[in-house]
């Protein structure tokens, strides 16, 4: 990791005497190395670069937990998006999940039972940058997970 950071940003990350570093390439790819990343500095970077996360949770609906979190993995395959969302807390979480873009035919896949159900309770919301998110209501039991599967609208 140290070698990669040194190659990409020209710094030695084991040293304390550097500031945040930013880089870009000919294909308009951008890199950021934040010396002391916090939720606030990441949110500021996303705002400055006009980035939106693939997925966001309504933080106000997630009970504070001493251990555990809501986590996710997002993969795309054959034109469909697969989100595996896990609740590692000791409480059932009822939350709104925002997926970047407009989705058709959303389904909930329960990996514990094999049950697949259509998600009918969703809505589109326009964002300040003109893009959209699809908001869905989810209840995820304690220490479990669910797949949300869908295809983005054209």
Where do the protein language model's features map onto the residues?
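Carbohydrate-binding surfaces of carbohydrate-active enzymes
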Residues: 1-154
